[in-house]
Amino acid sequence: MKKLINIIKDIKENLMSLQNLMHQEYDNLLKSKINIKKIKLIIEEKEFFLRKIASLKKEKSFLEKRYNIFPPYLQFNELNLHWDEIISICFLLKKKNIKNKIILNEKFYLNQRFLNTFQKYRLNQNNTTYGVDGHLEN
């Protein structure tokens, strides 16, 4: 039982680290100039924690079957307490992930609008135009 408690604590700690990374990602996405290297590093760290959490979940499932207990662990106070904290962290992570996704989509949209405007400008720049007096203008 102690091993299951430790695994659930590890899952909670990894989720808290993931939450910290999501806040860093959010702060970086809000900046007008995004540091791509920082974002890439954050993504790599998020992938690391997600793999670690997936591995811990497999161990947790094995121990739950072995002890024949399952979430929300109502009959075990310590497990239930940690499980409730995990659930609340997951809700916060979901909200932050949605915020990050919205900001990222807005940045892509603005970037695409800029590229489209720039292409139109370049196309118009190559066109030959004539002034009021009929002479070529550049």
Swiss-Prot record:
<dbReference type="Pfam" id="PF05130">
    <property type="entry name" value="FlgN"/>
</dbReference>
<dbReference type="GO" id="GO:0044780">
    <property type="term" value="P:bacterial-type flagellum assembly"/>
</dbReference>
<keyword id="KW-0963">Cytoplasm</keyword>
<keyword id="KW-1005">Bacterial flagellum biogenesis</keyword>
<comment type="function">
    <text>Required for the efficient initiation of filament assembly.</text>
</comment>
<protein>
    <recommendedName>
        <fullName>Putative flagella synthesis protein FlgN</fullName>
    </recommendedName>
</protein>
<dbReference type="InterPro" id="IPR007809">
    <property type="entry name" value="FlgN-like"/>
</dbReference>
<comment type="similarity">
    <text>Belongs to the FlgN family.</text>
</comment>
<dbReference type="GO" id="GO:0005737">
    <property type="term" value="C:cytoplasm"/>
</dbReference>
<dbReference type="InterPro" id="IPR036679">
    <property type="entry name" value="FlgN-like_sf"/>
</dbReference>
